[in-house]
Amino acid sequence: MAGLYLLGGRQRKLLLKGEEEWNLYEAALILHLDTGSGKVRTCVEYKSPLEARASENSSMVFKSGTLVGNTLYACTSTELMIFKLPEFERVGYISLPCFNDVHHVTPTCDGNFLVASTGLDMVFKFDGAGKVLNEWSVLEEEPWSRFSRTVDYRKVESTKPHTSHPNFVFELEDEVWVTRFRQRDAICLNKPGKKIDIRVERPHDGLVCGERIYFTTVDGRIVVADRGTRRVSAVFDLKEMSDPNSLLGWCRGLLPVDERRIWVGFTRVRKTQFKENVLWIRSVFRDGMASKPTHIALYDIAERRCLRECNLEAHGINIIFGIFPDSLS
């Protein structure tokens, strides 16, 4: 079985009581996991420069990215980075004032980039020089109606609570799509009116794979939509395939191995002050439940069972956003 690249971050060792999410993580990490031997090595440990973060204590985490061939497009909350694998040579870097709580970046079919700037409830398209080519609000409002073009939002620690919280942007032919956490759907931005209704829970990640579009929901489900019909065709509840006495965690990051096996990432649940982020926990938590550590798990969705797990906290990752294949291993 091939190796995996894991994107996330390491939590600070000394935390103040009530520390907010945007101050929790001291370094963005990319690890390589040999799924055969279980060996883990660090490929990238990164801290954003001061000009690209709000304060010295701002969290630094690699969020969700995109792997095309041997090129990895990764992002922090305020930056896009391009790496050539397997050496992880950094060959590109863009940071723009409109980047706030960026959750996902992907290259476009015309050679540009799309970013979900989650903190602004917007999606931006820009070229390799950082010139913004298009911008969309993910809500029924004009872009910038709630924010200012003159503010450098890299210097704003947080804009929470978010009205929508877009987190995964993707293309289907000539259409630009994005998932919306609060609205439980994915919508087409450049052809308004088209929508994939995710409904069962709030989505937080996705992947277009052949004729299937996979989405994770925060409570631990995989939602599969048909690329042709843009309709949900299957829902797999990973909680039903796992230890019923354990709280799986925030479900973010997925990688199909084949039509039946899929890797999924889970981040340990921690307390948060934002009501919208704990509703799903209240719906599944029962007395006696233990919160599982940050981990990845391999599921057989055909037999509906968990095949194996890997604890990531032992290797320094406390939050995980992305899982990508090492095609050379």
Question: Which residues are covered by each model-predicted region?
Answer:
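Short, conserved, GDST-rich strand-edge loop motifs in beta-rich repeat architectures
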Residues: 6-25, 59-62, 149, 154-168, ...
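Conserved beta-strand positions in repeat-built beta-propeller and related beta-rich domains
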Residues: 6-25, 73-77, 115-119, 164, ...
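Short loop/turn segments that connect beta-strands within beta-propeller blades
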Residues: 35-37, 84-88, 127-131, 189-193, ...
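Surface-exposed loop and turn segments in beta-propeller and other repeat-based domains
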Residues: 40-58, 94-98, 133-162, 233-247, ...
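Blade-loop segments of beta-propeller domains
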Residues: 41-106, 313-314
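Beta-propeller blade signature
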Residues: 22-36, 129-130, 278-304
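Loop/turn-rich, solvent-exposed surfaces of beta-rich toroidal or solenoidal domains
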Residues: 205-297
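Residue-level detector of Asp-centered blade-edge/turn motifs that repeat once per structural unit
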Residues: 66-69, 107-111, 171-173, 208-211, ...
